[in-house]
Amino acid sequence: MIRRRVVRAVMMTPDRHVLLMRVQEPVSGIEFWVTPGGGLEPGESDEDALRREVAEETGATKVSPGQLVWSRQCDFTWDNRDYSQHEYFYRVQTDRFVPVMDGNPAQGEASAFLEFRWWSFDDIGRSEETFSPRDLHSLLEGLSRNEPPEGPADEGV
């Protein structure tokens, strides 16, 4: 089992949109939407890891990590490897930009990436797509009202 600490950017615009990435698990083919982020390197702070991951995955280089808004523990299998990771989600206020994934050094990660999309909170609530965390819509709604979640984010996908 691979254990790791992960940081994720909840990149929100003033008009209630959030940047998500659609990814596909290589073995099962299951597709779902996630926030940009990834694992910390040895000695790296959460803030530095978040800046690095966002730059690698979206091309955005002027990211100012905001407050820690959610955390969760999740166990899953990816590419026939078992993971146990603790994820920390940081709010990042931003204007919309056109994301590009050309700085990701891990080819395996780049090949699992399918697309970016700026989702409105309302569209997430109405969608039949799969999001990670599964309760992303309610978490975003609470965040927009400055209400902390009652517990950890749903482990979901």
Range-by-range predicted roles:
Residues 127-157:
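Charged phosphate-binding loop/patch that engages nucleotide di/tri-phosphates or the phosphate backbone
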Residues 1-19, 39-42, 66, 89:
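Conserved N-terminal beta-strand and adjoining loop/helix that marks the start
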Residues 13, 25, 78:
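Acidic surface patches and DE-rich sequence motifs
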Residues 3, 42, 46, 132, ...:
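Hydrophobic (often cysteine-bearing) scaffold residues that line and stabilize catalytic clefts
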Residues 27-31:
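A conserved beta-turn-beta hairpin within the catalytic core of GNAT-like acetyltransferases
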Residues 21-23:
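Short, acidic/hydrophobic/Gly-rich beta-strand patch recurrent on exposed beta strands
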Residues 40-64, 72-129:
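Unchanged
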Residues 33-35:
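A short gly/proline-enriched turn/hairpin at secondary-structure junctions
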